[in-house]
Amino acid sequence: MEKPTIILATSNGVGMGHLARASAIALALKEYANPIIVSMAGGIAEIPEFMGIRCEYIPGRDRMWMSREKWDEYLRDRLLALVDETGARVMSFDGVVPYPGVIAAKVSHPKLALVWVRRGLWQKKPQRFVLGLQSQMMDYIVEPGDFARAYDFGPTAERKDARITASVSLFQKDTALS
């Protein structure tokens, strides 16, 4: 039986957390699926050679090469092209706020399952006001566990719409060199 293709999309983010988490998930999936990481983070260029995982780079809207509306259409079209090319039936998005282009890809391809990898420890910023609506647009929400979870008093702390998992890390004790 052929392994299914799963697209793991990440936002650009400020650091490398979204991309590192998607990389760890992709490594864990390799035995069971064909993961493809799609990211707006420039660091994605190092992953294919290092991890043996297919990656696609999509320049983020922060590049300001086009208007926000055009970029959302561009993102939607790039994601849909990848879904059509690979036959993927599942796409995850790891980022604080799912871009309209990600949601539009799901709306355009209703059989595509959309999973939000939504970290906890949200700050009380304006994004929290659309949290409920964005959550309803997802087929599934995964919240990776965090060592500081006991100190999470943000807008996701009391929500019951996510499956909380163990923490997700690239570090694997059994493969560490020392």
Model-derived segments and spans:
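Conserved nucleotide-sugar phosphate-binding/catalytic loop shared by glycosyltransferases and other
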Residues: 2-14, 28-78
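Structural motif
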Residues: 5, 89-92, 140
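Histidine-anchored nucleotide/phosphate-binding helix
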Residues: 19-29
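Short catalytic-loop micro-motif centered on adjacent basic/acidic residues
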Residues: 36, 90-93, 115-117
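Short, polar loop motifs at secondary-structure junctions
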Residues: 39-45, 99, 146-150
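Short N-terminal targeting/anchoring amphipathic segment
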Residues: 80-98
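Active-site-proximal region of nucleotide-activated glycan assembly enzymes
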Residues: 109-172
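A short helix/loop element that forms part of the nucleotide-sugar donor recognition site in Leloir-type
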Residues: 172-178
